């Protein structure tokens, strides 16, 4: 929805999640839209042929390359960055080993090794802090 607003296909909205499926269909020339529960379901529906096309995160296509065709990658200037934040929380029930292991995991996530793993699964790690 945000990409369609930014591309000028839909009118600006304070909350793009409130843009109806009907509005999107009309902006796309009246195509039938099947809104699935989440992007994983959309990806599966396209892969099995229940839907002809779908809009999903690139990372959700991993492992389905032989069953789907990527028609277009929408640029970040239309969508904005998709950020998956991580933080270590204060947990009074965690012992010292659990707390230090959690910190090690968070520290690992910002290493080059972790970036390589994320990139393997189609996550873009070229974002600004």
Residue map of PLM features:
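Exported/periplasmic ABC-transporter solute-binding proteins
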Residues: 1-129
């Amino acid at each position: 929805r945000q990409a369609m607003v930014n591309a000028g296909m839909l009118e600006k909205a304070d909350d793009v999640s409130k843009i109806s499926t009907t509005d999107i269909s009309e902006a796309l020339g009246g195509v039938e839209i099947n809104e699935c529960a989440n992007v994983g379901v959309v990806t599966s529906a396209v892969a099995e042929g229940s839907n002809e096309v779908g809009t999903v995160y690139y990372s959700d296509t991993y492992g389905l390359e032989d069953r789907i065709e990527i028609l277009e990658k929408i640029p970040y200037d239309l969508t904005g960055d998709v950020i998956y934040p991580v933080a270590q929380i204060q947990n009074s029930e965690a012992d010292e080993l659990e707390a230090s292991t959690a910190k090690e995991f968070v520290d690992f996530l910002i290493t080059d090794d972790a970036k390589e793993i994320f990139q393997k699964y189609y996550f873009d790690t070229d974002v600004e802090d």
